[in-house]
Amino acid sequence: MSSVLKAFERFTIEQELQDRGEEGSIPPETLKSAVKVFVINTPNPTTRYQMLNFCLRIICSQNARASHRVGALITLFSLPSAGMQNHIRLADRSPEAQIERCEIDGFEPGTYRLIPNARANLTANEIAAYALLADDLPPTINNGTPYVHADVEGQPCDEIEQFLDRCYSVLIQAWVMVCKCMTAYDQPAGSADRRFAKYQQQGRLEARYMLQPEAQRLIQTAIRKSLVVRQYLTFELQLARRQGLLSNRYYAMVGDIGKYIENSGLTAFFLTLKYALGTKWSPLSLAAFTGELTKLRSLMMLYRGLGEQARYLALLEAPQIMDFAPGGYPLIFSYAMGVGTVLDVQMRNYTYARPFLNGYYFQIGVETARRQQGTVDNRVADDLGLTPEQRTEVTQLVDRLARGRGAGIPGGPVNPFVPPVQQQQPAAVYEDIPALEESDDDGDEDGGAGFQNGVQLPAVRQGGQTDFRAQPLQDPIQAQLFMPLYPQVSNMPNNQNHQINRIGGLEHQDLLRYNENGDSQQDARGEHVNTFPNNPNQNAQLQVGDWDE
């Protein structure tokens, strides 16, 4: 029997790894589009600044073809390079397009009509067409310029420092658009605004050179539609990761933004590893987890085998990203989400309520985290030299705070699982943590609920009047405090199915226990309760939100 189990384990692991081709193998060639990329061989800041504005206009032009936008994007991201000719060779690695370099000497005065070099493969008609495209901005672009300030485009730029400040300010906005171009491109840009504010505070982004939101959206759309551009950006991210502490401003900036791009689309996988395997708590020994633990082991081996590009599977549209979808390990994913909702306050904004979420194992995770969060790791305690009395004191301290019995704090006891706004204390300001991203990243892979921006329905007061005052957010952890292990939905009457497996729903609904005979409702303590004492038709309050901070 043991040989069969070992064979099954090897089979599961090899199933994830055997279909990979050799590294660097050339795929079957398909038809390629011709992409013209403009090259400036001079460090003249005036010419480069005109090329920067020219590329922005081509990207935003309403009649530009996809190949025009791709060439403009590659040119735009190559402008800080001292040798554009060599830097653009990164795009030659893409099997998706044929790159044609066009050397440009400058622009005709007062226009965006290109002055090609004698070696440039540009006809007079193409030069005239590019000039028309640069002037053909859509009506959604205000003041006839992609910038928020109308006078920015016509300002003189005769110093390298001026050009670099303007170029980096534009490029950092384009890189921020890359962060969500594949996972949340259609969602409100709340996280992008926070990142813009961060880089303005750091001095990397000058507010005067901000692009209009419509221009930012068009840049994001062009990047999303072009695999060539995203492959080029992946090479740039890998170059930035290899830089040492002494790096130039541009690659230091790219390396910083790359932390938000790495492992996008894999949030569920890494959260499962963090809260299920990382905690090393006893429920991992459940027999139901055995097969899924083998699955996770094979996925970790697959991730390591993919090498450096494993961080950018979503950006590269790699099919291997489907292997990491949580639908392949639903039980241990449900357990990990239960643990995470107790340990990490940011998990409340993560849409973990997928169709395959198992209520039993989610609740096992919740109860395990509540009971085990005060336990002491004996190995760490031995390294610190803690005595048995000190270990007991630490455990009692955590248990007391977890139960809301903290003493000596103004305003009464504090529940660490209630948001600060409910405790009437100043809300904490969290930094932008790149490791914890939105829940939208797995929506395409497993059919889970997409990422949503937070709104609240107005509460209904007694007498049928709607109360539009600010309502306190329902705490999903507090609502689950006394929830028993509820039965499967399939065993419940039809009129009660919709009231099961809802996490953070109506105020008392998740605390109720139903019997099969349809008797009166009881709460978790066996007391008969009135679920909605004021109005039986009371609306639910939805808790949804952003997953960035």
UniProtKB/Swiss-Prot annotation:
The gene is N. InterPro entries: Paramyx_ncap. Homomultimer; forms the nucleocapsid. Binds to the viral genomic RNA. N0 interacts with the phosphoprotein (via N-terminus); this interaction allows P to chaperon N0 to avoid N polymerization before encapsidation. Interacts (via N-terminus) as N-RNA template with the phosphoprotein (via C-terminus); this interaction positions the polymerase on the template. The modification Phosphoserine is found at residue 439. It comes from Mumps virus genotype A (strain Jeryl-Lynn). GO terms for molecular function: RNA binding; structural molecule activity. It comes from the Viruses. This is Nucleoprotein. The keyword RNA-binding applies.
